[in-house]
Amino acid sequence: MEKLKSELWMTAVATCMSLLLYLTILRRRHASGGRSLALPPGPTPLPLIGNLLCLGGIFHQTLAKLARVHGPVMTLKLGLTTAVVVSSAEAAREAYTKHDQRLAARPVPDAFRANGFSERSIVFSPSSDPQWKNLRGIHATHIFSPRALAALRGIRERKVRDIVGYIRTVAGEEMCVREVVHNGVLNLISTSFFSMDMADVRSESARGLRGLIEDIIATVAGPNVSDFFPFLRQLDLQGLRRQTGSHLGIVFGLLDDIIDRRMAETRDHPDKQRHGDFLDALISLASAGKIPRYHITYLLFDVFAAGADTMTTTVEWAMAELLRNPRVMAKVRAEVTDALGGRESFDEGDAASLTYLQCVFKEAMRLHPVGSILVPHLAVQDGVEIGGYAVPKGTTVIFNAWAIMRDPAAWESPDQFLPERFLHKEESSSPPLELRGKDYEYIPFGSGRRLCPGLPLAERAVPFILASLLHAFEWRLPDGMSPDDMDMTEKFATANVLATPLKAVPVASHTS
C-alpha cells in the first residue's frame, strides 16, 4: 500500500514538473519569436455569442470596415466557431499560393446536410475526396471544356436572340432588366443541359423547379443558429434543415423525372438521334459506369443554383454602371457598332473579340462581384500561416472578394467604375489580368483548387448578352431620372445584387 502511494505521488510530481516545463518552453518560444503564432487580431468577442452583434448591415461591407480597424487578416468569433477573414490582395496571394491544399475543404452549412446533399455536391466535398476529383473532371471535360461549350454555342446564341426578341416587344417601355435577363439565362442553361426552357413555359414542373431552387438558396444563405453553435445541430431549432430537405426532395424529384424520361427514351429508341446536350453526355457516363446515376441530379442542381444568379447579376450590374456612366456607354456601343459594320446579327465570337466590351465585363465583376464573399474554406491541417498569424485546423477562412478587389494597395481609384484600367493592363508589358484566379487582386471566381468550374460558361455568355443588348437597343433611364439619381445600393443575399432592381427603357436601334 505504501509503495502504491509512493508511486502515485511520484507520478503526480512528474506530471506537474512536465507541465511546468512545457509552459516554460511555450512562454520562451513566444518571447523569442518562435514558430508558435497567435491568431490574427479582431474585435473583442462577447461571451458565448462572440462577434455576432458586430455583423449587421451588408455583410461584405461590414467585414471590410472591421478590417480597416483590425487588419487585412482578422479573427471573428461567430458564436462558438472561429473564422479568419482575408481582406487584401497580398494576404489572398499568401493564402492561395502557400496553403491552397490545406484550405481546400469547405465548412458545411447545417441546412445543406439535409438529404445527404453536402456529401454528394461538388461544392462541399473536400478536394481530397476521390468523388470530388471525379466530379471536377466531369465538369472540366464534359460540361465546361472548350469543345463541349463550342458544341452548344448555337443554343446559347439562339437563347440570347430570344432575349433580344422579347425586349423588342416592349421597346420604348420601362422594363425590369433583372427579370428579363434572368428568364433568358435560365432558358440558356436549361436548354444547354436538357433541351427544355425553364422560364415562360407551360410546364408546371419547370416553373416549380425555378422557384424551389431560389427558395433553397435563400434559406441556406440566411443565418442559422446551428452553424454558430454546433452542439445545437441535432435540434435544428429554426427548422432550416427540415425546410431545405423538403425543398430538395421536391427539386430532386423534378430533376429525376426529366432525367428518367430521357434515359427511358434512350433505352427504348436507341436509333433515335440524340439531343446533343449535356444530359446526353452525363447519361452516357452513367451508362458506362463512370458515375453513379444520382450524380447527374446533383450536378444539374449545382449548375442551376450557381449559374443563373451569376450571369444575371453581372449583366444587371454592368448595365447599371453603363447607364450611370454615359461616356463608357457611348464608347462600348461605338465599339460594338463599328465591329459589326452593317451586319444586323451578332454572335458569341463577335463579343469575344471586342476589347473594350471585355474590359467593361471585367470591371463590373471587379466592382460588383456576384460572390462578394467567396464560398468559405476550411483549414484541414495545422501549419497555415497568413500575414504572420496562425490559422489552426478547423478554422473557417473567409475571403472577402469585394474588399480584395477594392484594395487601395492593389487598385488605383478602387471605388470608381473605370473599364480602362483593364485596357491599360492589356497595353502594358505585364500580362493582362485574367478571371482564373492567378492574379490575386482579381478573384471574382475564386482561386486555386476551388476555382468556380462554371467560369468558362460565364466568360462566354455574359459579354455576349451584354453586346447583344447594346447592339440592338439604345438604353435610357426612365423619364425624369438622371444618372446621379440611380440607386446603386447593394443587397447581400444569395448574391451581391442591386437592392433596387434596375429599371430602364430600351429603344430599338436595329431590326433583326
Swiss-Prot record:
The keyword Protease does not apply. Its EC number is 1.14.14.122. It is a single-pass membrane protein. GO terms for biological process: defense response; diterpene phytoalexin biosynthetic process. Its main location: membrane. It catalyses: ent-sandaracopimaradien-3beta-ol + reduced [NADPH--hemoprotein reductase] + O2 = oryzalexin E + oxidized [NADPH--hemoprotein reductase] + H2O + H(+). Belongs to the cytochrome P450 family. This is Oryzalexin E synthase. The lineage of its organism: Eukaryota, Viridiplantae, Streptophyta, Embryophyta, Tracheophyta.
